[in-house]
Amino acid sequence: MWNGKKKAVTFSIDDGVVQDRRAVALLNKYGLKGTFNLNSNYLGQGGLTTWLKKVVSHSKVEASEVKDLYKGHEVAVHTLTHPHLEEIEDEAEIVRQVEEDRKKLSELCGYEVVGMAYPYGTYNDKVVKCILEKTGVKYSRTVKSTYDFTPQKEDLLRFHPTVYYVEKCLEEVVDKFLATETDEPQLLYIWGHTYELDAELITWEAFERVCQKLANRDDIFYGTNKEVLL
């Protein structure tokens, strides 16, 4: 349990794009917490991306704002440059991508970064072994939705989230979580990218509606990924 509470909610948001500013404001408004997974080599860079034929900003937040922007939340590793780690043959390069990102982000934030999300959600046994043996990362998130609320207590370098927030079943999953009554611990872990909200894969209004539903519940612990997993 979490501080005596049987339920916990956490968010995980990738890439460190400027739309995170709006998402952080919403999470703060409703007393929710999240973990933001950043590529330190890309901080401050501009860019665009296309989703559902809609061009949206993929510009990254500035390094100078990371500490204050994500205050009260958690910053975590997303590697230096967002490669497919499982395609890298050189183990030293896998370690460099992860550990140098972790160290740079730790310096920016003023605390030791210990979490991670895999770029593209992809990995293999070699990647996991490198991270386990040669980095300071304690957990790493995949992109495989479980739609289940049973907390994963083992193999945290292959941690699977509950639901991706662009999935049509998001609100159904949230409602099911809220309605579940059990003596067993229950974790709702929601992940995504905030530029997807601009692309309206899920609207900002729908995202806020989910935040409203989850907020101000006496039986729920609101924490970062680190706080609910470690």
Predicted segments with their positions:
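Active-site metal-binding loops of divalent metal-dependent hydrolases
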Residues: 13-16, 79, 194, 225
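Hydrophobic "anchor" residues on beta-strands that sit immediately upstream
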Residues: 10-11, 74, 220
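Short amphipathic alpha-helices and their capping/turn segments at secondary-structure boundaries
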Residues: 24-29, 58-70, 175-181, 211
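A short acidic, amphipathic alpha-helical/loop segment
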Residues: 22-26, 126-131, 210
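Glycan-processing catalytic domains of CAZymes
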Residues: 12, 77, 145, 151-182, ...
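C-terminal domain-boundary segment and adjacent tail
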Residues: 1-2, 29-31, 40, 106-107, ...
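Metal-dependent polysaccharide deacetylase catalytic core of the NodB/CE4 family, i.e.
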Residues: 30-126, 146-147, 152-158, 186-197
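Boundary/entry segment of secreted carbohydrate-active catalytic domains
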Residues: 1-19
